């Protein structure tokens, strides 16, 4: 039997996985069973590929996961702050 995870459980599980990689600058949004994980540019390279695999493996297949990497080496928090209007318009947060 597959256990259905609620938003809080999903967010907690992702934060736990990201914490293993000592990533401090990230953001998680869980909306209507969809997950948006904002990670720094450095996470595009290995060994962080394993993190992405772990995130996909830890969640139910019915949950859609999107991973966003802010460009130009900006911090995730800076990128979100600078682009908050556009991000809200696109309903990403």
Go through each PLM region and give its residues:
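Structural motif
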Residues: 38-42, 70-71
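Short, surface-exposed beta-strand/loop "edge" segments at domain boundaries and coil↔beta transitions
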Residues: 43-49, 74-77
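Short acidic DE-rich linear segments
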Residues: 85-93
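N-terminal presequence-like segments and adjacent domain-start helices
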Residues: 1-9
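Short edge beta-strands and adjacent turn/loop segments
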Residues: 19-40
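A short amphipathic beta-strand at an alpha->beta junction
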Residues: 57-84
């Amino acid at each position: 039997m597959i256990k259905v995870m609620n938003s809080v459980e999903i967010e907690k599980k992702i934060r736990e996985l990201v914490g293993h990689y000592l990533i401090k600058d990230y953001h998680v949004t869980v909306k209507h069973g969809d997950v948006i994980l904002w990670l720094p540019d450095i996470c595009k390279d290995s060994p962080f590929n394993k993190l992405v695999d772990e995130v996909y493996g830890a969640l139910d297949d019915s949950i859609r996961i999107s991973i966003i990497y802010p460009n130009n080496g900006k911090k995730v928090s800076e990128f979100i702050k600078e682009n908050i209007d556009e991000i809200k318009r696109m309903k990403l947060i």
